[in-house]
Amino acid sequence: MLVGADDKSLLARFYHADRALTAVASELDSFDGRAEPVRCTRLVGRLRQGQDRVLAITNQIMDELLGEDRAARAFRAKFPEEVLQESLAGQLWFGAECLAAGSSIMNREVESATMRPLAKAVTKSLDNVRNLLREQCLRNNTPNSLTLRLDVNDAATEQLYESLKIFDRLFAEFELLYVSAMVQVKSKQEYEMQELICVLFSETLQRALKVGLLEQEQVDSYDPALMFSIPRLAIVAGLVIFKEGPLNMDQPADDISEMFRPFRKLLIKMRDLLRTLTKHELYQLEKLLCTNEEISLKEQQIICDGNEIVGGGQSPSAAPNPARDDTVVIVTTSATVNSSDNLRGQEPQEDISSFYTSNNRRTVDSEPNEDDDVSESNDEDEDEGEEVDEDDPANILKDALVTSDCASGYLIPNTNFGNLLQTNEAPLTDSFIATDEELKLASGAASSHARIEQILSESNQKLTDSGLGTANPSLDHSPELETERPVTSSHPIAQSSSSSSEEEGEVDEYDEDDSESTLCEPKPHHTKHQRRHRHHHHHHRKHYSKHRSSAAGSAGTSGTTCSAAERQISSCDTSPSSGGLPSECGSSTSGGSSGNSSGGSGDADAAQEVAMAIRAAGRIKFKTTENLLHRLFVCIAGVADQLQTNFAADLRQMLKSVFVINSSPPEPEDPPEPAANSTDKPKEPDPADLFEFRASEQDVITNSGGSSQSIYSAEEVNAEDPHDSVFGSPPGGASPVRASSAPRTMMTTAASSENGSVTVNVSVSVVTAGSGGSGSGSSRSSQERSVSLSETSIVVDGSGGNTEGTALLVPRESTPKSVQSEQSGQRGMMEERRMPEAPPRWIPDGDAPRCMACASSFTPFRRRHHCRNCGGVFCGGCSSASAPLPKYGLTKAVRVCRECFVREVGV
């Protein structure tokens, strides 16, 4: 049976494709390719195309004949997105022939030797299938048949069926091995980890919708901004909210997904800082991650401000553990001095508060105090062996000059990540979160237990020398200052089992107790005695005091133990000139703890104390909460945005699934309206047509029925419908303004007059058509203009009953203008107020296998890029230009193709 060239059946198409492929292969074998390299290259390209066509038709035949008996290819889910192309089958066939001929994949000699027997089996099985299909084409072909009509009782048909099954199984096995050798393929464990990350993304999105960080409308419209917001919020949620999820940094590094494994150490440091944030600070950070707007706190808050700490090793709903000791964090203090030194006299009155020192850097916040003299702080740094004289306010202000932690803006392009994206082998330096001192202190605390005992003994000795152990009450009874208050953390402590946490001296839990904590505030003395109040502050990282009862002390003595490793000066001390009387005392009273503790529990408390001091050291480094939130934003956004480059295909697939899961269910379609009423109302735009932009409140007209219709241009308004207009013609022949036929309630301030009329001044923009003549029957101009009602008043007459809802546009008394000048001015105003156009639809990646400019095929190294102006798909070279697109509301430069760049910019 002859097979015609115009036959469209599967067997006929296979027959002609196979003949063309055989002809190209025969021509390649007829000459020496090294002698004619150009001809050889051209024929090899034709050979690859012929193989693609033959295998594509063979796959269609196997789909029809084998059906559900085809070999499973679920492993393709582990392949990178760039590998799954139409030409994959042809590449596999070409690779199998090369391996069967003795060639090897470059730098993959071992894998090539392993695959060579399978490659030979694949090529042999494929040759057998081609021969059987050619025979079937000549015996059982039905011209232009849409389906295969083979004789099931024929032995050749049964042989073809079994041969196709064998080839399909061998080809699937070879596909998995060959692709795994050529590119990095996910393991089963990694695939499951990424599924868990997808679940984390979905949980994060649902939480963001619940707390109001995002809106359901953004999800339904597939807002591109969510591509960045969801991964950023997921990092925060995975570190401090869903702590047992895929971002659990306490598990071994091998159990963390490859997406976040390079940032493991950075994520650990970010987690520790996130757990010190209050709920308000965490909300501000998440809002910043969504909007990139500047942080606006209600007041200038100190670093440790707040009674609630986010995180702490357990869920926020967990109950506190009353069996633990109480933990008091002294946030900021303010000390006053009544000094009668002859050399001082009367000096400017200041109140020094929140005095933090880190590596000889100070941040001083001064507040006026009407009753007190200058505060004095004589701070000593025994580690570095230098004294700082702070009696002179000039020295204090001079030392208060501190460089900003990060001078760049909040946007990622302005930030140099430098040490941000470091691997596990290179620890971060103090330019971001941790400092070398903290790392040394952490390693020292984890390695030397004897050092802890020495620290505690030194602290107890200092407290004894300073008179902290005395039970003499303070004689001051002045009201406490607002800037000085204790904060009790409510998080239990548990030792971390992670080796990395031990190296960095990090403990994942906090102390927690139901006990009360009291702090005696400094109070001015209005007596003839000369008293000097000295306030000692901790100079290294944090103000931290913990209630510990000394075994050698009396049962009634209440004191505070501060870690000497952090050089914590106690908040209770005496002045040399005060005769030993304590001028400031901080005490902590436990609710039910014993006064004595065993040596084992003391060692554990000491280790926990040092670890907590190390944890809070990173936060004290930042002088304000805004600096801390800014730094966390830079780090979190840097990690999340880096995923857009390293795992672009995986991230797109995850976010696509998240959008599908969390999008609103489709609303039931309304019955079609009658044709007569179809022209009365402007057509509501399809949500699918709105890619990025939504109408603002000023651009939405709300009818009495509650429906919202977005007006994007003047063409959507029917200004000539007399039945739909409630406005009369204003003086001067202006055209009637279109409005809803139903009565409308306008939420503005109205002033009523004696005759019952109401004058309403509004500031909205109404689109109307310009009149071409003086009479109502005159022809109207096609040009449209916008009338600003801020220059007019709407007078509603409520006295008459026959003209319900009638309103007139009355121009205010102003300088008379001609109609032409008014039209030109209003036309310019319309251009100003015009809504941005809807951006073009993006062509799906699957519909563009080649660049739409240079026709180059996309590969794992030549990626797709969309032009924001035309929506086309281009390679990086053809879409390297950038230009702002004001017509779409894009005021910043975005990616455009070369043709659109020339058209928009004109160069």
From Swiss-Prot:
Family as reported in the entry's similarity comment: Belongs to the lst-2 family.
PANTHER family listed in its UniProt record: LATERAL SIGNALING TARGET PROTEIN 2 HOMOLOG
Coiled-coil spans in chain: none
Annotated Low complexity bias: 550-565, 777-793
Compositional bias annotation for Gly residues: 592-602
Alphabetical list of Pfam families matching this protein: FYVE (PF01363)
UniProt cross-references to CDD domains, sorted A to Z: FYVE_LST2
Feature: compositional bias, Polar residues: 351-361, 463-475, 486-495, 568-580, 742-751, 816-826
Zinc finger (FYVE-type): 845-905
Ranges annotated as biased composition (Basic residues): 525-549
Membrane-crossing residue ranges in chain numbering: none
Record field: compositional bias (Acidic residues): 367-393, 501-516
Keyword flag Phosphoprotein: no
GO MF, one annotated term: zinc ion binding
The keyword Cell membrane is assigned to this record: no
Cellular component GO terms held in the UniProt record: early endosome membrane
Organism in which the protein naturally occurs: Culex quinquefasciatus (Southern house mosquito)
Function: Negative regulator of epidermal growth factor receptor (EGFR) signaling.
UniProt-recorded name of the protein: Lateral signaling target protein 2 homolog
